[in-house]
Regions:
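Intrinsically disordered, low-complexity, charged terminal extensions of DNA damage-control enzymes
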Residues: 152-308
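Catalytic cores of DNA base-excision repair glycosylases
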Residues: 2-164, 170-183, 196, 246, ...
Length: 308
C-alpha cells in the first residue's frame, strides 16, 4: 500500500484491510471483487491484484507460509527483486541488499555512480556495488536495522531535492558531496511519455436510484474494477441507448482525472430511465448502498456521489 501512496492516506485502508483479511488464507480465498472493494480510493489497483495473487500462491504452493529467501520471494506474483530483498532482510534477516528509489539515491551519491540508471546494465552494476557495501561483520539480527536505516536515510536526509548533507553520517566519505554533484545524482534520463485519452462516460440510473456499472477487463485502465461504461465517442455511447432515450441524455461538465503517466478527459452523460436494461453481459445495476462494497475507481465514486 505504501508504494506510491503516503503513510497518512494508507493507515485507515491498512487497518480495514487487516480486519477483513487477518491472514494469508483468508486473503487467498477472497474474491477479487472483495479485495478491490477494500482498495477502492487508493489507486494503483495492480498492487491489490498482485497482492491477491501473491496470497493465493503462498497458500497453494507454500502451505500458507511465506518463503524466507529473496530468491524464492521473487517467484511470487508482484514481488520484484528489491521488494523481495526488503522482505528477506527486514523479516527474515537475510544478508542481502535492496535497491529501492531511496537506496539508489544514497548509494549513487555516496559512491559517485554517474551512469544512467535507465539502462538495465547500469542498474545491475549499482546493485553489485550495493552488495559490496553490506557490512562484513553484520549479524543476522542486524540486517533489518541496516536495511531500514538506508531507506530512512534516503527518505529523510539524502532526499531528491535539497538534501540535508550536514546531517548525513556519510558526508565525509560521500563522493557526490565532495565533488559538488549531489544535485546531479542519480542519473536517469528516460522518462515515460505522458499521454491523454478522452472517454464519454454513461451515467445511467433508474428512478429507484440504481446505477449501471460495468466490470472492466483484466487489462487496461481500472482493470478488474466496476466502473461506469466508457466509450471513445459520444456517438458510440448513443448507439447503445434504448430507442428514443438519447434525447433524454444530458451531458454535464467534463473533467480530467490524472493517472501516473496518463490524463483521462472524462465526459459524463447522464440518463435517467424508468427501469434497468443491459448493454453487455459485463453490466450490472447497483443501488447506492452497494457501492461501498465495490471496487470503484475514485473519479467514478466521486461522480456518483456528486449526482446524489
Amino acid at each position: 500500500m505504501l508504494q506510491q501512496t503516503q503513510v497518512a492516506t494508507v493507515i485507515d485502508y491498512f487497518e480495514k484491510f487487516l480486519d477483513r483479511f487477518p491472514n494469508v488464507q483468508q486473503l487467498a480465498q477472497a474474491s477479487q471483487d472483495d479485495v478491490l472493494g477494500l482498495w477502492s480510493g487508493l489507486g494503483y489497483y495492480s498492487r491489490a491484484r498482485n497482492l491477491h495473487r501473491c496470497a493465493q500462491a503462498v497458500f497453494a504452493d507454500y502451505h500458507g507460509y511465506f518463503p524466507q529467501t529473496a530468491l524464492e520471494l521473487t517467484s511470487l506474483p508482484g514481488i520484484g527483486p528489491s521488494t523481495a530483498a526488503a522482505i528477506a532482510s527486514l523479516c527474515f534477516n537475510e544478508r542481502v541488499s535492496i535497491l529501492d528509489g531511496n537506496v539508489k539515491r544514497v548509494v549513487s551519491r555516496y559512491l559517485g555512480f554517474d551512469r544512467d540508471l535507465s539502462a538495465v546494465a547500469n542498474e545491475r552494476a549499482l546493485w553489485s556495488l550495493a552488495d559490496s557495501l553490506l557490512p562484513d561483520q553484520c549479524s543476522a539480527a542486524d540486517m533489518p536495522v541496516y536495511t531500514q536505516a538506508l531507506m530512512d536515510l534516503g527518505a529523510t536526509v539524502c532526499t531528491r531535492n535539497q538534501p540535508k548533507c550536514n546531517d548525513c553520517p556519510f558526508q565525509s566519505d560521500c563522493v557526490a558531496f565532495a565533488s559538488h554533484k549531489t544535485a546531479l545524482l542519480p542519473i536517469k534520463t528516460r522518462k515515460l511519455k505522458r499521454t491523454s485519452e478522452s472517454h464519454w462516460v454513461l451515467v445511467a440510473h433508474t428512478v429507484a436510484g440504481e446505477v449501471m456499472l460495468e466490470k472492466r477487463p483484466q487489462k487496461g485502465i481500472w482493470a478488474g474494477l466496476y466502473a461506469l461504461p466508457m466509450f471513445d465517442s459520444y456517438g458510440a455511447l448513443v448507439q447503445v441507448l434504448p430507442a428514443g432515450q438519447h434525447v433524454k441524455a444530458q451531458t454535464i461538465c467534463p473533467f480530467v482525472h490524472v493517472l501516473t503517466h496518463k490524463d483521462l478527459h472524462l465526459h459524463p452523460v447522464v440518463l435517467q430511465t424508468p427501469s434497468s436494461w443491459a448493454i453487455a453481459e459485463s453490466v450490472k445495476w447497483f443501488a447506492a448502498d452497494q457501492w461501498a462494497a465495490l471496487g470503484l475507481p475514485q473519479p467514478v465514486r466521486k461522480l456518483l456521489q456528486s449526482l446524489g
